[in-house]
Each structure stands twice: as C-alpha cells, then as structure tokens.
C-alpha cells in the first residue's frame, strides 16, 4: 500500500447550500465513536480526536440523537466545552426512535420539538447549526414536519434545516415550505444511485450535498481485511455487501482502487475520498474515524488531484454491475430515500 498523501493542505471553507451556512470542505462523522461500529471508544480519546479535528480545520461535526442512542451527542457536548463550540458547525439529527424495543421513524410536530429540546440539552448548546430529519416519516406529510422545523428556526433553536435519505420529490415538497440547506446521503465510489435524480434536484434548488460513508463504511481503507476485523457488535457484519457471497467480487473493486492509489502516491481511502471531493464545490464528505492518524489521512485527500480520465478510470472499477449486495440490511432498507414518499398535506389531521 502506498504512503499517505500528507495532510499539509489547509482545509478549505465552502458554502453549504445557498442559505448562508459556511462549513469546512470536509466534515467529521462522529457516529462510530459511540455506536454501530463496535463498542464505544474511550471518551477522553474521542474528545482529543474531536479537538484535533477542529484545530486542523475540520469544523463540521456530524452526530444524531440515535447514535448510542444519545451518548454521541453527550460526547460532543463535552468536547464543545471551553470555547470549542464557537469554532464549529454543529449538525445533529432527529427522526429515528426506539420505542418498546422497536425502531420507529417519527416526524410528527410534537416529536420534532421534543427531539430538538433533547438534543439541545445533551449537546449543552442553545442553538443547533444544522438540524436534519434523519429518516423521513412516511406517515406524516413532509410539509407538516418541515413546518415544525420552520418554527424552531424562528425561535432560534436551530439555524438551518437538512434532510437525510429523502427522495427528489420529498426534497422539493420540503423546500417549498422552508429552504433546505443540505441533504445528507450515502455517496461513494460504490454508492452512486443518488446521481440520477437527487443530486440534480439539490443543485437545481441550491441545496448543499453532504456525503456520508464516502469510504464505503471503511471498505476503501482496507478491503476484505476490514470485514475480518469487525467485532460482533459491529452492524457492518450484517450489511449485504460485506457478506461472504458478495465480498469476493467487491474485494476486486478495492484491489483495483488500491493499485491506482499506489500509482498516485496516496492511500486507497484517500483516492476514494478525493473522488467524492471532485464531485463539485457543493459537496461535503463527512468520513468518520476514531483515530487521529486516519483523520490526518482523510485531510490529506483534499490535496489529491484527479484528472477527468482518472475519475472515469476509478468509476469504471465500481460500476453498478460490479458492486455486489445492497448498502443496508433489509430491515433498514425500508427507510432509505427509495422509500421516503409521504402522504399529501391534504390528508393530515392535526393531532
């Protein structure tokens, strides 16, 4: 494996969307520090990592109330003390609830407000910079959910509104109620189905694009070896792409990316991340990590330059036909953007 491109480049700033929010061109996804990717990591180490990121210029911090649940927001609350809050753009999310041991998606006004109050309390802040609906509630017209978020903006509790895993039509309906600043979606070398409809819709409406899992949930850092190292508590063990019947074919994609990275003098993860950065000045990837060394490597991806020919070559390695398996287990796939249409506003009876 090639040496990493150094993290010498300053992390540039970018406008996210067209409503006035400015962020670092690369953010930090904080989920894996507390949840889903194995046991929670030691809190002092994670606070140090967040502080290192902010000092390096990675100031968009991304969390959600479902990470833990709640523990990731509490971690960020500790990391933001001592003047750090003023140096960051803080993004969190609502909408996935665990009730009676079952996962539910909620976007009704009372829930939206209660969730926001809970996040403000855990984060120890009086305002959230970017507040996303994490998953779309298919029982509630999107106009109703956004209407409550609009009130929270007017009250100063949140500054900007975002959506995650929303279809193009849902984005349009939401944006008509209150301008949407950002849409968060999975976008990487091997997750490109958003390019057909959602990305053009965001660009037409002046909505910023936040790419989560830009490294394929770590796959583009280590390939098949990543899967061997996962603990039993790691939800990636259940992702179809990481199952044995799909892994052999998917590993070939990684090996091709790895070989190209060696030629470019960077790591495969830097190459995969650079590909996302090259999608446009309106795109902000938010790779997650729990190690300072990997964070520095991710920042180094900002200095990896790709020609149009190299972009096309990379894309040829991971065409839709080459990628085996879905990006989510079946139980979670029913809340992705492909399943995010909501009832018409005319059907809503206020509770």
UniProtKB/Swiss-Prot annotation:
Arranged from A to Z, the UniProt key words for this protein are: NADP, Oxidoreductase
Q: Name one GO cellular component term.
A: cytoplasm
Which of the seven top EC classes does this enzyme belong to?
oxidoreductase
Give the species: Oryza sativa subsp. japonica (Rice)
Q: Which Gene3D superfamilies does the protein's record reference?
A: NADP-dependent oxidoreductase domain (3.20.20.100)
* Residues forming the catalytic site: 67
Q: What is its EC number?
A: 1.1.1.-
> Which parts of this chain are annotated as the region Disordered?
317-351
The text of the family note is: Belongs to the aldo/keto reductase family.
Could you tell me what this protein is called?
Answer: Probable aldo-keto reductase 2
A molecular function (GO) held by this record is: aldo-keto reductase (NADPH) activity
Database matches in Pfam families: Aldo_ket_red
> In which residues is NADP(+) bound?
213-223
Q: Which InterPro entries match?
A: Aldo-Keto_reductase, NADP_OxRdtase_dom, NADP_OxRdtase_dom_sf
Q: Where is the composition biased (Polar residues)?
A: 332-351
Q: Give residues annotated as binding substrate.
A: 134
Q: Which SUPFAM superfamilies match?
A: NAD(P)-linked oxidoreductase
């Amino acid at each position: 494996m090639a040496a990493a491109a150094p993290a010498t480049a300053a992390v540039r700033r970018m406008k996210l969307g067209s409503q006035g929010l400015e962020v670092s061109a690369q953010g930090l996804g904080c989920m894996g520090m507390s949840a889903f990717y194995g046991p929670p990591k030691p809190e002092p180490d994670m606070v140090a990592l967040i502080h290192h990121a902010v000092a390096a210029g990675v100031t968009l911090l991304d969390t959600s109330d479902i990470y833990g649940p709640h523990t990731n927001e509490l971690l960020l609350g500790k990391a933001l003390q001592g003047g750090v809050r003023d140096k960051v753009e803080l993004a969190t999310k609502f909408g996935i609830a665990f009730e009676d041991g079952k996962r539910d998606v909620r976007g009704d006004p009372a829930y939206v407000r209660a969730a926001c109050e809970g996040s403000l309390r855990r984060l120890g802040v009086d305002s959230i910079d970017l507040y996303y609906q994490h998953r779309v509630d298919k029982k509630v017209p999107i106009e109703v959910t956004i209407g409550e978020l609009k009130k929270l903006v007017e009250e100063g509790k949140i500054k900007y509104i975002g959506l995650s895993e929303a279809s193009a039509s849902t984005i349009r309906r939401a944006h008509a109620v209150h301008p949407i600043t950002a849409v968060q979606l999975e976008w990487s070398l091997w997750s490109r189905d958003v390019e057909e409809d959602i990305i053009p819709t965001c660009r037409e409406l002046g909505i910023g694009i936040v790419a989560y899992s830009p490294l394929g949930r770590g796959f583009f850092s280590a390939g098949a070896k990543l899967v061997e190292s996962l603990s039993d508590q790691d939800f990636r063990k259940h992702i179809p792409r990481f199952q044995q019947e799909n892994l052999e074919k998917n590993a070939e994609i990684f090996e091709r990316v790895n070989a190209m990275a060696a030629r470019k003098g960077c790591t495969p993860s830097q190459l995969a991340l650079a590909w996302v950065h090259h999608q446009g000045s309106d795109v902000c990837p938010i790779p997650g990590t729990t190690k300072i060394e990997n964070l520095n490597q991710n920042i180094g991806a900002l200095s990896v330059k790709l020609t149009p020919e190299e972009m096309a070559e990379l894309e040829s390695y991971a065409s839709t036909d080459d990628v085996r398996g879905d990006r989510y287990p079946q139980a979670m796939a029913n809340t992705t953007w492909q399943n995010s249409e909501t009832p018409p506003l005319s059907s809503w009876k206020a509770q």
